[in-house]
Amino acid sequence: DKEEIGSMGNTGMESHVFDTFISELLNKVRINRPNLLDKVFCNSRMLSADVDAGVDPLYAQVSDMNNAGIIGEGISLNKYTGSGGKYNSSDANAEYVAYIRKIFNENNIKYQLAELGKVDIGGGGTIAYILANKGVDVIDCGVPVLSMHAPYEVTSKYDIYSAYNAYETFFKN
């Protein structure tokens, strides 16, 4: 909740609400050990299912064309998200990126490696860095969007279907 305003507030990912929720789940199954929540996070894997900034041909100068999400080319994997270099960011480790690519390749998931924009021009944040700071292996994985946050946004049905297949494959593995 509240990702668009920095994940702050009493229900944002920066609050304790998520930790409390996971702790309550553990209590419901009667599992209670010292440092259990930390262990759960450190043994977890996550796809941060947020959208990616697709290349806008009218504003191509804000994209790094060698590393940009292209609409119609499948779901985007963003190893690194953030803005202004590596400030307030998440940078997935190489082993986790390789794991995700392996399961996507084995299941014929169409994906592309991308970033949110040129350093100091584009960029943006997701909740990935918050979970990464808790020890979760996480990578941003979402549909490229043309004109993100504009009154009209455009996505590709193929990319949406690719996302569906990617998320299903992730849960099965």
Task: Describe each region flagged by the PLM.
Residues 1-70:
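Acidic/histidine-rich catalytic neighborhood of metal-dependent amide-processing enzymes
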Residues 7, 15, 23, 44, ...:
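Generic serine detector
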Residues 13-20, 91-99, 122-125, 158-165:
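Conserved active-site and cofactor/substrate-binding residues in soluble primary-metabolism enzymes
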Residues 15, 32-33, 93, 113, ...:
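Alpha-helix initiation/capping motif
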Residues 22-30, 55-56, 101-104, 108, ...:
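Structural signal for hydrophobic packing residues in well-ordered secondary-structure cores
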Residues 143-173:
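His/Asp/Glu-rich mid-to-C-terminal helical/loop segments that flank catalytic regions of hydrolases
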